[in-house]
Amino acid sequence: KNIPRGLFSECRKITMMSLTGNYAEIKATDLRKLKNLRAVNTSKAIQGNLKEYCKNLKNNKITVSSEMKKFGKFLIENKKLIEYTGNSEVVKIPKGVKVIDDIVFRGENKIRKIVMPNTVRTIGKEAFDSCERLTEIKFSKKLTKIGDYAFSNCTRMKKYNLPKTVKSIGKCAFRWNYSLKTVNVPKKVKTIQFATFENCVNLKKVNMKSVTSIERRAFCGDKKLKKVKLNKKVKVGKKAFLFTKVKGQKTI
């Protein structure tokens, strides 16, 4: 069972709460109206960043079930990294983590380098969104999925050495990467989704010969993009190369 939508919408004076029922999931948005919440005890990990809504909530006042483990500044549940509370320039994700949850590192502007263990399979939505000082990432060699907006607005990243195991890259995943210069799309990726590389204004070269579908606005606004290696049978969506130097939709 889930928490009914809007259940706590009028309970703004609550400062402490215990949610120990058999819930399928508990989302941060379920508790977003509890502005005065200072401590919470749950039977399951809270999905999302509750601190975004409950400014008075301290890290040491969130207690959860035995499924949760804390490794230094990392909070992990069932091999999913769900929270990071550090302020390091170099972040080494603990071994054993398979999933980096949504928005875990969003807006962490002190981070310059990320090192992932080879256990990581999935990077969630907005996981590294707006990490504006990030310049280097060592990816897991077994990574298969990159979520929507995962690296959007990482303005200092010049190149992503994506492993050949990647099968899926979400929409807007690398949008507004102003320093990005070259892209080599892994062979297992067949679709470039909506606005994946939109407004990467310094992007000059893209190799994506295995891609068979390019969705709308995928490279829109990449004003320096000229050299593109494409599959001969690729299907190109509207405005995919709008405001670029690509002449025709199948320029090689």
Task: Enumerate the predicted regions with their spans.
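Consensus positions within tandem repeat domains that build extended binding/scaffold surfaces
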Residues: 4-7, 30, 102-104, 124-127, ...
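Eukaryotic protein-protein interaction scaffolds centered on beta-propeller repeats
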Residues: 75, 79-83
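Structural signature of tandem-repeat unit edges
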Residues: 1-2, 11-27, 34-49, 58-73, ...
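Conserved, function-critical positions that sit in or immediately flank catalytic
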Residues: 54
